[in-house]
Every structure is written in structure tokens, then in C-alpha cells.
Amino acid sequence: MEGFSLRINQFLAHYTKHSRREAEKLVLEGRVKINHEHAKLASVVKENDKVFLDKRLIKPLKNKKFSVLVYHKPKGELVSKADPLKRHVIYESLEKKYAHFAPVGRLDFASEGVLLLSDSKAVVSALMHANLEKEYLVKIQGFVTREMENAMQEGLKLENATKGAHQKTPIKSMEFAPFIGYEIIKNHAKYSKLRVIINEGKNRELRRFFAFFNAGVLDLRRVRYGFVNLNALPVGKARFLNRQEYNELHAFMANRANVKGD
């Protein structure tokens, strides 16, 4: 990242396993130094600065030639640059310096949760088309029925999958692969809660799936995209991948390159 400047909490979250909140605590505890001087919460790390945590030098990843943001998209935001209907779009919430970052897939207007964005087209394309696991917390109307469970286990093919979709959707039929996994958290006549894991990203896939069983989706939150978890990231906030996530991303990209080269 040539010419970069980051607040100390961002730097630590970017290049270590610590969250921004944990990084702030480390700074307050006096465990962080910049060029051998104790860091403050307002300290900014510049390109040639040396940052130490507990006297150990933090070395930025030399092979990281791209950046990836993790954004906790709120409900009521569109994953788009602009909207003719004047609805709020994600780039109105993100800092202007991220205007050139592209989203990895979509998360519909009424849903919230993990949305990844990157300044690398190759990374965006790889993450979008790799069939990585996506984990969701879903709240639906009514009971989780045996028919639903059978479809989650065995898959489902619908010639008419427009229920749960936008009125003007061009996608009429849809085939749903068996879910990777699911857990029924609450099963009640008024509403039920599930944790589901899928590895597809079709248009309003989960809303269409549950609508077929007359179970409208009341709430939908994506809590994991591949190796990136939402964890405690507040709604409307963004962070960089941490060191562990970047390591996993580099391994993932290297593996894809090796597969293509075979």
C-alpha cells in the first residue's frame, strides 16, 4: 500500500488479529509505539513509520497489493453506485476514498450483514464466482415445516420462483441446491429463526425459497462470507480484513491461480 496513512486503530486492525476496539485498548494500555514513541488514539501511521506492539515490530504484508473492506450493510441501502429512485446507496455511507471499490456480489435492499468490497477486480471476480459458503441468520413467518427441511436437505427446483422476488424480476424459474447446513434456532407459529449456510448467490435466493412455502422472510442477515465473519462489526461500519483473513485470501487466490494453471 504505497503512500498510505492510517489511524493507529485501523493499522492494527489491518495488520494484526485485533479488532479496532481491541486496538484502541492496546493503545490506551501503552503497549503500542510508533517509531519508539507511545502511540495515542489520534496517532496516524504513515508509509515509512515503524509500529511496535509489545516491543515486536508489526510488518505489513509485502505481497498485499490490494485492499478488501468488510462493510456491515444496513437494511435500506442499495448495493449500487446510484439509484434512479433516489434510494440510499452504500457509497453514500462509505468514505469517499473507497468510491472506486467494487462490491463482491449483492445483498438486497431489505437485508443486512457482511458485504465485501475491493479495489482489485481480480479479487472481486474470484470471491464472487468461487461458490464460497455464505451464512445467514433468517427470521421467517410461521413454523419451519418438514417440507422446508426436506427441500433444504435435498434441494428444490421451481418453474415459478417469482414469489419473494421483485415484481419486475426477469428470473422466473430457479433451482436451489441442497443447503450446506442449517440450524433451527426457534420454531414457533408466529415466527421462526434459522441459521442457514449456502454456497450460491442467486437473486433473492432465500426469500424465494421460503416464499414458496408461504413463509415470508421477516429478517435476513448475512453473518459470514467465506472466511470473513461479521462478528461484532456495528451496522453501517467498515473495516479492513485482518492479517489472518488476508493470509486466507492470499492462499485462496494462489490456489485458484494454481488450479487455472493445471
Curated annotation (Swiss-Prot):
- The organism's superkingdom is given as Bacteria
Active site at: D108
Q: What InterPro entries does the database record attribute to this sequence?
A: PsdUridine_s_RsuA/RluB/E/F_cat, PsdUridine_synth_cat_dom_sf, PsdUridine_synth_RsuA/RluA, PsdUridine_synth_RsuA/RluB/E/F, PsdUridine_synth_RsuA/RluB_CS, RsuA_PseudoU_synthase, S4_RNA-bd, S4_RNA-bd_sf
> What is the reaction catalyzed?
a uridine in RNA = a pseudouridine in RNA
- CDD domains with a match to the protein in the record: S4
> Mind telling me which PROSITE patterns this protein's record contains?
PSI_RSU, S4
Residue span(s) of domain S4 RNA-binding: 6-70
Instruction: Give the keywords, sorted.
Output: Isomerase, RNA-binding
Pfam families assigned to the protein according to its UniProt record, in alphabetical order: PseudoU_synth_2, S4
Q: What GO MF annotations does this protein's record show?
A: RNA binding; rRNA pseudouridine synthase activity
Q: Which GO terms describe its biological process?
A: enzyme-directed rRNA pseudouridine synthesis
Q: What class of enzyme is it?
A: isomerase
Q: EC number(s) for this protein?
A: 5.4.99.-
Family, according to the entry, reads as follows: Belongs to the pseudouridine synthase RsuA family.
Name of the protein this chain belongs to: Uncharacterized RNA pseudouridine synthase jhp_1352
